[in-house]
């Protein structure tokens, strides 16, 4: 891709489930950040593409766009690749601009686990037990022996021989870097405060090895996955502005980076964390680059096993990896996370003076999504 410019973007503070955004529906949280992006850059996008992971409504992107006060003439598309939805939304937007189908698009995503919908069964469903039969909507229900993300992390640790001793330093590192970034205001220019939020609620500045040693496995019969090496569930929103070179020049928009390539990869759903590495490999192959040519990496560390897998597959990148900490500290608002890590990646490149940056997300079901940018 030579024509796709990354102008910038914004994210909300990231709230805990039941935290500061506990009464805020997903579309309103998304709308607040979406509106802030249009105002910051003084643009009216030609399309909105939004990721959302837990099905907050039919074409929730359209609802968020209308709630943000955007003209009815602007179409909006919702994307569901579970945890990778926000990054896939950006990849889709870049492809549309590269193909000449649009000149300016806002893409990203949002999530409210606090107001996560509940699913009701009708009389034709085998689980129907009367009018009061409800369950929380969940990732990939029913596939592959009901394996969910926690079990996927546990199985990954078992198959890849990852110990808590190997993963604990990554947990400590994530909270330390995130706490330092918050104290320094390193990300303040990409954060918009809304609905009374004043901080990222998941960061624990006092996280310690002593605390980690006391945490039991959260799975019956398990040995690895605990409340610290698995990410929090969260509420949040993030969007980026993409434009063609011609549009950016005509509207005097400063270009911060170019979107160069995107890639997706599928793997074993039972060990879904590995899909982030599969997607990175596919991205590097498509770009014709070695991992040694990438200055900064940003992975959505939903589990510490992802950090360990990355360090084994791409050694020597600790200084340029998740420079401001990752999801083990900030948390993981599913549909927003891809856009969040892209914004953090851009800030990392600027801080370190790097050229190429790669972002990757592993998603429920064993699908990975990755994106390559080049700082201008």
Report residues per predicted region.
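Active-site pocket-lining segment
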Residues: 260-329
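Conserved catalytic cysteine-centered active-site region
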Residues: 52-102, 143-148, 206-232, 313-340, ...
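Phosphate/pyrophosphate-binding loops at sites that engage ATP/ADP/AMP, CoA/4′-phosphopantetheine
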Residues: 35-46, 156, 160-161, 248-255, ...
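Active-site pocket-shaping loop/turn-to-helix segments
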Residues: 11-38, 54-55, 77-91, 103, ...
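Buried hydrophobic positions in well-ordered alpha/beta secondary-structure cores of metabolic enzymes
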Residues: 7, 45-48, 86, 93, ...
């Amino acid at each position: 891709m030579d024509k796709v410019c990354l102008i910038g973007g914004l994210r909300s503070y990231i709230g805990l489930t039941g935290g500061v955004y506990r009464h805020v529906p997903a579309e309103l949280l998304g709308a607040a950040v979406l509106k802030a992006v249009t105002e910051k850059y003084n643009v009216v996008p030609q399309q909105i593409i939004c990721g959302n992971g837990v099905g907050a409504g039919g074409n929730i992107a359209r609802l968020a766009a209308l709630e943000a006060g955007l003209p009815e003439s602007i179409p909006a598309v919702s994307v569901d690749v579970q945890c990778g939805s926000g990054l896939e939304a950006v990849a889709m937007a870049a492809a549309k601009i590269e193909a000449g189908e649009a000149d300016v698009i806002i893409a990203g995503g949002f999530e409210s686990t606090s107001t996560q919908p509940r699913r009701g069964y009708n009389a034709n469903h085998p689980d129907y037990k009367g009018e009061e039969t409800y369950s929380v909507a969940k990732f990939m229900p029913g596939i592959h022996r009901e394996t969910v993300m926690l079990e996927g992390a546990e199985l990954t640790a078992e198959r890849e021989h990852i110990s808590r001793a190997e993963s604990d330093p990554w947990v400590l590192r994530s909270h330390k870097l995130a706490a330092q970034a918050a104290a320094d205001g390193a990300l303040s220019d990409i954060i918009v405060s809304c609905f009374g939020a004043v901080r990222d609620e998941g960061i624990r500045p006092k996280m310690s090895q002593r605390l980690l040693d006391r945490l039991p496995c959260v799975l019956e019969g398990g040995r690895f996955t605990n409340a610290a090496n698995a990410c929090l569930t969260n509420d949040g929103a993030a969007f980026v502005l993409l434009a063609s070179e011609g549009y950016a020049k005509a509207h005097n928009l400063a270009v911060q980076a170019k979107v160069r390539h995107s890639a997706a990869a599928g793997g074993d759903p039972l060990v879904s964390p590995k899909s982030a590495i599969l997607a990175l490999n596919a991205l590097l192959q498509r770009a014709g680059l070695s991992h040694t040519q990438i200055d900064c990496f940003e992975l959505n560390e939903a589990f510490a096993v992802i950090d360990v897998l990355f360090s084994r597959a791409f050694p020597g990148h600790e200084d340029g990896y998740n420079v401001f900490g990752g999801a083990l500290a900030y948390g993981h608002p599913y549909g927003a996370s891809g856009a969040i890590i892209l914004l953090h990646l851009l800030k990392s490149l600027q801080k370190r003076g790097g050229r190429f940056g790669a972002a990757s997300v592993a998603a429920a079901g064993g699908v990975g999504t990755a994106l390559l940018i080049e700082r201008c």
